[in-house]
Swiss-Prot record:
Residues 265-338 form the Myb-like domain. InterPro entries: Glutathione-S-Trfase_C-like, Glutathione-S-Trfase_C_sf, Glutathione_S-Trfase_N, GST_C_Theta, GST_N_Theta, GSTT1/2/3, SANT/Myb, Thioredoxin-like_sf. One of its GO terms (molecular function) is glutathione transferase activity. Keywords: Detoxification, Peroxisome, Transferase. The lineage of its organism: Eukaryota, Viridiplantae, Streptophyta, Embryophyta, Tracheophyta. This is Glutathione S-transferase T2. Residues 1-82 form the GST N-terminal domain. May be involved in the conjugation of reduced glutathione to a wide number of exogenous and endogenous hydrophobic electrophiles and have a detoxification role against certain herbicides. The gene is GSTT2. Residues 243-262 have a biased composition (Polar residues).
Length: 591
């Protein structure tokens, strides 16, 4: 049964468990338990974790909560986990446990308490608490100092002096990553005095890429939302006493007048995707996935494939004057486009199927948009992406416009005797694009898919030929029998030839049956000979074993006689009680 992980990516322990599973290629289903909607308090979830907290896992019959316990279990239960995460060395494991226990009582109260009471509380329906934030900041500062002076002392790259991260590194770094939701200046104020901690965070992030950035993307989006709220509050209530500025300046510092400029620079680095950007990304994906000279089919790794796409997007002439996007950003945007467009394709198919007489194409679009909103409670905003992808096999409509005009019929026309039917998604049934007609583009098969297809075709052809040959022989026999029964006439030249053919066919069948019988008889004879040889071998082995046992018994008897002879040769009083007992016992056995 597949592992189930119940998590909310806004939760630090949840992010640690998700990154660990992804890095170690553990197959799992991620089930969202929204903390904002209080889903962790539902009766259904409390059957899994009575504490009402995330993360929790279900692995077969096992239900487990607490992130540290989950990480230890996954490290021990799954063979794909590399040893450096939770080494077999018991002394190293003990040190990891000491770090994890310290984490719960020091770093976690400091980091979580500060972020909650200075930024996140309003999002959870709670008031901000500057006093609690100041207390948490003191705990956080002391914890960072302890990390740098004790756990990261010397030139250690990771905790405990290892060259690779452990579950302790992952758990603590995910804890500190929640500081990303703070204002940039506030976050740097807390971390910049601790250079070793910053290097350690970056080393752990690189060791878990690209999964670390993917899972922490929710923090980056939250940071953007909080920054917009700060800007709106600053614009509506300017002045040094602004409440929003106070939240980001707990501890005696102030954002100052450079807050807006800093936010503008950060937004320039993380600019939004525009429709032209989406079109370039889609073109890059289609070209990279369909070009037989470039694609390495199923043998290429995912990051190599996306690096090609990222290079294609960065080299686009229309984006020459803009900051380059990373390949993992392109992958995240593509996943969103693919998800939304696939959902809209289903709604568009449903609208085409329901198309009534007299409805125009615009009417169908309106119905599709309404179906999308009814199903997913949001508007479809990627029509430009759908229009780029609609002519490809994966995203094309399953209903043709011609059939839809006739009342939504989905009947297909047989094109040839090979069992091929017309369909809007069948490349063979789509005509060549003439006078602006649209043509569905098909993705080329990969190496393995092509070989499998050729093998299936060859096997199918061979089976069809055998069946056709068998049917032909049966039909010939049936015709001969029917003619003989119906036409009870004197044999002429034609009847003689038919009778000769029938006799020859029956003779051939009898010869085949006789050959099969002889073959089976020969196999039985060989089997009987084999059984006789095995029985003879067993008999010889049994005889040898009996002789061996007899020889062993004779050796034992001779040994006892030698011992008795030695004891009898001694004078009275020279033997001990045990030797006298042994001598009497041997004499009794001999008699």
């Amino acid at each position: 049964m597949k592992l189930k992980v119940y998590a909310d990516r806004m939760s630090q322990p949840s992010r640690a468990v998700l990154i660990f599973c992804k890095v170690n290629e553990i197959q799992f289903d991620e089930i969202l338990i929204s903390l904002g909607k209080r889903q962790q308090l539902s009766p259904e979830f409390k059957e899994i974790n009575p504490m009402g907290k995330v993360p929790a896992i279900v692995d077969g019959r096992l239900k487990l909560f607490e992130s540290h316990a989950i990480l230890i279990y996954l490290s021990s239960a799954y063979a794909s986990v590399v040893d450096h995460w939770y080494p077999n060395d018991l002394s190293k494991r003990a040190k990891i446990h000491s770090v994890l226990d310290w984490h719960h009582t020091n770093l976690r109260p400091g980091a979580s308490g500060y972020v909650l009471n200075s930024v996140l509380a309003p999002a959870l329906g709670l008031p901000l608490n500057p006093k609690a934030a100041a207390e948490a900041e003191n705990i956080l500062t002391n914890s960072l100092s302890t990390l740098e002076t004790f756990w990261l002392k010397g030139s250690a790259k990771f905790l405990l002096g290892g060259k690779q991260p452990s579950i302790a590194d992952l758990s603590l770094v995910c804890e500190l990553m929640q500081l990303q939701v703070l204002d940039d200046k506030d976050r740097l104020r807390l971390l910049s005095p601790h250079k070793k901690v910053e290097q350690w965070i970056e080393s752990t992030r690189k060791a878990t890429m690209p999964h670390s950035d993917e899972v922490h993307e929710v923090l980056f989006r939250a940071k953007d939302r909080f920054q917009k709220q700060r800007e709106m509050a600053t614009a509506s209530k300017p002045g040094p006493q602004s409440k929003i500025i106070q939240f980001s300046s707990i501890g005696g510092t102030s954002d100052g007048p450079n807050l807006v400029q800093d936010t503008t620079d950060r937004k320039a680095r993380r600019r939004k995707w525009s429709p032209p950007d989406d079109v370039i990304l889609i073109s890059a994906w289609l070209n990279t996935s369909k070009d037989r000279k470039v694609v390495v089919y199923d043998e290429q790794q995912a990051h190599t494939f996306w690096k090609r796409i990222g290079a294609h997007v960065s080299n686009s002439a229309s984006l020459a004057n803009l900051p380059k996007r990373e390949w993992n950003h392109c992958r995240q945007r593509w996943r969103k486009i693919n998800d939304y467009v696939c959902k809209f394709v289903g709604c568009y198919d449903q609208a085409l199927n329901q198309r009534a007489s007299g409805q125009s194409e615009d009417d169908v679009f309106q119905v599709a948009y309404q179906l999308y909103y009814n199903n997913y409670m949001s508007n479809f905003k990627l029509e430009h992406a759908w229009r780029e992808l609609r002519h490809n096999k994966k995203w094309c409509s399953t209903y043709t416009s011609e059939n839809s005009k006739g009342g939504g019929s989905s009947k297909r026309t047989k094109l040839n005797g090979g069992g091929v039917y017309s369909s809007s998604c069948n490349p063979e049934s789509v005509p060549i694009a003439l006078d602006g007609e649209e043509q569905v583009m098909d993705r080329p098969l990969g190496v393995k898919s092509s070989k499998q297809k050729e093998k299936k075709v060859a096997t199918k052809t061979m089976l069809e030929e055998r069946e056709a040959d068998s049917r032909s022989r049966l039909e010939n026999l049936w015709v001969l029998d029917e003619e003989e029964q119906v036409m009870d006439l004197p044999l002429g030249v034609k009847s003689s030839k038919q009778k000769e053919r029938k006799v020859a066919t029956k003779t051939m069948i009898e010869e085949r049956e006789a050959a099969n019988f002889r073959s089976r008889l020969g196999n039985l004879w060989l089997l009987k000979e084999k059984e006789e040889r095995e029985a003879d071998s067993r008999s010889r082995l049994e005889n040898l074993w009996a002789l061996k046992e007899k020889d062993i018994e004779e050796q034992k008897k001779l040994t006892r006689m030698e011992v008795l002879k030695s004891l009898l040769g001694r004078r009275t009083g020279e033997t001990s009680e045990k030797e006298e007992t042994l001598k009497n016992k041997l004499i009794d056995e001999m008699l």
